[in-house]
Structures are given as structure tokens and as C-alpha cells.
Amino acid sequence: MIRAFDQLSLPLLRWLDAEDAHRLAIQGLKLLPAVKPRADDAKLAVRAFGLNFPNPVGMAAGFDKNAEVPDALLRLGFGFVEIGSVTPRPQSGNPRPRLFRLERDEAVINRMGFNNDGAEIVLRRLAGRANQGGIVGVNVGANKDSADRVADYVRLIETFAPVASYFTVNISSPNTPGLRNLQQASQLDDLLTKVLEARDRVRRKAGDTPVLLKIAPDLSLAELDDVVHVARSRGVDGMIVSNTTLARPNSLREQMRAKEQGGLSGRPLFRLSTRMVAETFVRVEGAFPLIGVGGIDTGGAALTKIRAGASLIQLYSSLVYKGLGLVESIKADLTSTLLRTGRESLSEIVGADAATITAEDWPV
């Protein structure tokens, strides 16, 4: 089914404007039959944040912003899905065009600006799938015109606690002016204190929903020191490393398209984000797990991200170029690696190469 979907959709979608193609992909997923997914190899199971993931491959936030197709994605083999980013009130985001393919680089630049249907509508959709099962996280953000962004995050935690498998506090999108300032130590401390207090207030009716922090790959190591210190001190359950980058590597082939403003994702982000995973892993010192994101487009890339320190991984931009069949391909490669090396689970290799990657001889 997945192969047929890719064969039919990928050539067509390439001819469309990137955002129109994304919209068509969402509509196509709504039409897929509700077929039970193939059971994953037990070796791929991951226990993290108090949750049991059937496999480590997740759909990153940004694809299903409005919780329209989380169950279709789970049926296609993802171990978990992260919807959003969601803001308290609906917002249209930045003007189009705002999504660009760099095809020769297998990359994407976006300046979407947290366009979404708002908390009320997204909550209704998630509540409607309450008995479906599967891990569906909610990525939360602040409205662009908010007078109190911390209050936005608190409101979203309280709103979505009954339906979220976990929360991602997104303070690292480059497309909302000033949002990344929340990564500064004093502001981050205040934000996480209030977010975790909100989570604790609703614990009785919603359970102990994990709260993760998503960071940018463009932090300096000193800034990363501060972020990890605050995250550990306040007791977050995990971190997602990383969001898109504002950097433009000299290696990009599509230099004219690379001049578009926004966050760069896809293959050119791989080394930068993997280095940031490793740097975060050594600073976290096992206090909580990490999800690695950025440029994962093969089983080998997934393995590298895991060995850098990621317990779980997420995909998005690579699916634009490789199709949804990439999910099963990565899982098959990871299973083969475990069998070949005689290991029982991926947890045995998480962070195995972190020290090497953080060394000077593993340049970005």
C-alpha cells in the first residue's frame, strides 16, 4: 500500500507548489484504508518518557499541524506522531510563498509562521480519536501577537493534557519573531517553571503527561550549557534536538533558492543537528532521553543519530524526497543492524559515538 501511494503521489506532488503538494498529501492520507499496521520487531521497541514506543521512528511536528491524519500515519508504520505546532488562537501564518524545495540538496526552507486551526478545533479532532491508541504528541507554540507568550504555553498544556501522549514546548521555531529568545536562561526558567506547574495541576485528570523541550541547532555551546542546566533543574522529561537552522552551508547547490528566509531542514541539516544531539547527550548525563531530528534520510543516518545520543528519531523533510516507504526502510535497516551485531535493543547503542562526534575531528 505504501509503495503504491509513493509511486502515485511523488511524481505528481513534485509538479505542484510545495505547500499545495503538502495539502494534497494530507488529503490523500485521509483516503487510505484503515489497515492495521504490520507488527514491529520487538527489538525496535523503546521505553522513554514513561511511554512504550513500538519503534523509534516518529513523524515530526509540522507535517500534520492540525491533527487531521495522526492515525493514518500510525498505520503507515510510524512509532509515534507529533502534531502541531498548535497555538491558542487560530492564525494564518506568514504570507505565501513560505515553503520552498531545494531539490538538488534534498532540503526544504520554510517560514510558515505557526499557521494552524487553533486549540479549540485541534482539541476536538484529538478528542475524537480518544480510543484509537498509539502515541500522539502535541507540539505547542505561542501566537505571534500574544501579549504573554508564557501564558499561551500554560493554556495549551491545560487544554491538551487529557488527549496528549506527550507535550513538546516549541521555543525554537525561527519563523515567529522573538520566540527563540525564550531559550535564554532566565526566560526559559520562568517558562518551564510555569509549564510544569500547569502539567502538575491537571495531573489528577490527565495523568503525568511528559513535557519535552525542542531546541534550535544554532545555539552556541555556552547557550546549550544554560538550556540543559535549566531543563535538568526544572525537571523536563526530555528534549528534541533539533529544529530547523538559519544557517546556509556553503555546500548548498541551490544558492539562489537558499537566499529565501526561513528555517532550513533536510539533508544539509544532518551534520549540524547530529553534532547538537551529541553535545546535548553528554551534557544531559542520562537525566532524560533525547529525540533526534534533522536530515535523517536512510537507515544509516538514523543509526548515526541514535549513536550520537538519540533514543528516538523523527522524520519530515526526507519524506518529501524519499516517500513514506522510508519509514519501513529505516526500521528494516535498524533491525538488520541489531541482528548483525547481536544486540537485543537500540538502547544498547544510544550515545555510543557521542564522545567522538563532539570531538574536534567530527566537524559540522
From Swiss-Prot:
Does the keyword section mention Manganese? no
Name the Gene Ontology biological process terms: 'de novo' pyrimidine nucleobase biosynthetic process; 'de novo' UMP biosynthetic process
The record describes how the cofactor is bound as: Binds 1 FMN per subunit.
Under which EC number(s) is this enzyme classified?
Answer: 1.3.5.2
Q: Name one GO cellular component term.
A: plasma membrane
Signal peptide residue numbers: none
What compartments host this protein? Cell membrane
InterPro entries for the chain: Aldolase_TIM (IPR013785), DHO_dehydrogenase (IPR050074), Dihydroorotate_DH_2 (IPR005719), Dihydroorotate_DH_cat (IPR005720), Dihydroorotate_DH_CS (IPR001295)
Q: Which residues bind substrate?
A: 65, 110-114, 170, 175, 243-244
What Pfam families is this protein classified in? DHO_dh (PF01180)
Lipoprotein as a keyword of this entry, yes or no, is: no
Where in the sequence is the active site?
173
The reactions it catalyses are: (S)-dihydroorotate + a quinone = orotate + a quinol
Keywords (alphabetical) are: Cell membrane, Flavoprotein, FMN, Membrane, Oxidoreductase, Pyrimidine biosynthesis
Q: Which GO terms describe its molecular function?
A: dihydroorotate dehydrogenase (quinone) activity
Pathway(s) the chain acts in: Pyrimidine metabolism; UMP biosynthesis via de novo pathway; orotate from (S)-dihydroorotate (quinone route): step 1/1
Biological role: Catalyzes the conversion of dihydroorotate to orotate with quinone as electron acceptor.
Assembly and interaction partners: Monomer.
**What is this protein identified as?**
Dihydroorotate dehydrogenase (quinone)
Q: Which lineage do the record's taxonomy fields give for this organism?
A: Bacteria, Pseudomonadati, Pseudomonadota, Alphaproteobacteria, Hyphomicrobiales
Q: Gene encoding this polypeptide?
A: pyrD
